[in-house]
Each structure stands twice: as C-alpha cells, then as structure tokens.
Amino acid sequence: MKFTIVFLLLACVFAMAVATPGKPRPYSPRPTSHPRPIRVRREALAIEDHLAQAAIRPPPILPA
C-alpha cells in the first residue's frame, strides 16, 4: 500500500515536470537586449576624448 502511494506521487511529480515547458536557454550566458547602448556609450566616450583634447590644446596665437 505504501509503495503504491509513493509510486503514484512520483508519477504525478514526473507528469507535472514533463507537462510544464522549460525556459529556453539563452545563446550567451549574459544576453544583451540590443547592441545599440554599447555603441552609443563608445561614441559618447570618443566625443568626450575629442573635447578633452581640444581643451588641452592651447589656443592659436594670432598676429596683432
């Protein structure tokens, strides 16, 4: 009697596990939503570098 109850319980657990669809595995471990934010960040850093170089460069001396 005890064996049949355990067997039925295991069968129910197995049926529930098979019936619920599993999560699809992502292709990469850390999937990114879109590559655009990284590109925008790179462009912003490049613009910041250009502005820093322009600020460091001394202004040209104009003849009087």
UniProtKB/Swiss-Prot annotation:
It comes from the Eukaryota. Keywords: Antibiotic, Antimicrobial, Cleavage on pair of basic residues, Glycoprotein, Immunity, Innate immunity, Secreted, Signal. Residues 32-40 are annotated as: Critical for inhibition of translation, possibly due to its role in mediating interactions with bacterial 23S rRNA and peptide chain release factors. The record marks 30 as: Critical for inhibition of translation, possibly due to its role in mediating the interaction with bacterial 23S rRNA and rplV/50S ribosomal protein L22. Glycans are attached at residues 28, 32. Proteolytically cleaved at a pair of basic residues corresponding to the RXK/RR optimal cleavage site for furin proteases to produce two distinct antibacterial peptides. One of its GO terms (biological process) is innate immune response. Residues 1-19 form the signal peptide. GO terms for cellular component: extracellular region. The record marks 23, 25 as: Critical for inhibition of translation, possibly due to its role in mediating the interaction with bacterial 23S rRNA. Residues 20-21 form a propeptide. Belongs to the drosocin family. Unlike many antimicrobial peptides that kill bacteria using a lytic mechanism, proline-rich antimicrobial peptides can enter the bacterial cell to target intracellular processes. 'Buletin' is named after Philippe Bulet, whose dedicated efforts in the 1980s-1990s characterized many of the Drosophila antimicrobial peptides, including Drosocin. This is Drosocin antimicrobial peptides. It comes from Drosophila simulans. The lineage of its organism: Eukaryota, Metazoa, Ecdysozoa, Arthropoda, Hexapoda. The gene is Dro.
